[in-house]
Amino acid sequence: MQISSLTCALKTMRSGCLFLGLLLSVMSVHAHDAISADARKAYLSRLDELAKTAQGNAPAAIRANAWLETGKTLDEIRALLNEDIISHGKTQGLETSVLVNMLNASVHKLHLSPQTRLYLSDPRPYREALALDPRGKQASLARFLLFKYHFYDSFVDHPLKPIKQSKESLLEMIGFGENLLPLSDPGIDSEEVHFILGIHYLQALDSAALPKAKCQARVAEIVKKFRSQWPSSLKLATLEALSSP
């Protein structure tokens, strides 16, 4: 796979994370507004109710789930905003502007990547969920979403050139990926986990964050898994291109 094709493939995968936002915008709002008045009110009301639960006196599992749902809600909003930016170069519409301003005035301040000019996922809700109930039934999904969004927010065009990713952060993400691999959960995309974990091992190889032999062995195992389970996957082609000498 040529570099130009690889870059296109990675942008396609990143855009795939925004597909839900595109569907929501097509189905539920006016032609030029990513977010309607009703959607804005519903989002803010939901975030307010979730905050009351997350910061209340409910059992840890219930508060953890509220944090998880907060993260999912914020990422749903983020997908809509980013789809607007991708389509029009900026967010559009009065209600969208009102929602962005209200979020920025709250604890849910939005952060725009200076490199991609897209809104970044907020890891805090997922980390709060894991801190409250690390072995609960919502923990695996929180870990997966943190793992997934960290990856797609971490680079511009080339995943082996991450933006300011520390060794500690890389090793944490590898640990998350290894923890997620054996799980069978409808909310966790196994192909995505294998792909991102493979890329992280290639990053660890490039940065010498882990022994060379270990990184090469794990990448080979992941590629072998792809060839047997997802042989026509674009992710397999990307892994093969990135791992070739």
List each model region and its residues.
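Bacterial N-terminal signal peptides
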Residues: 16-26
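Bacterial N-terminal signal peptides that target proteins for export
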Residues: 3-17
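Intrinsically disordered, low-complexity peptide-like regions
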Residues: 1, 28-31
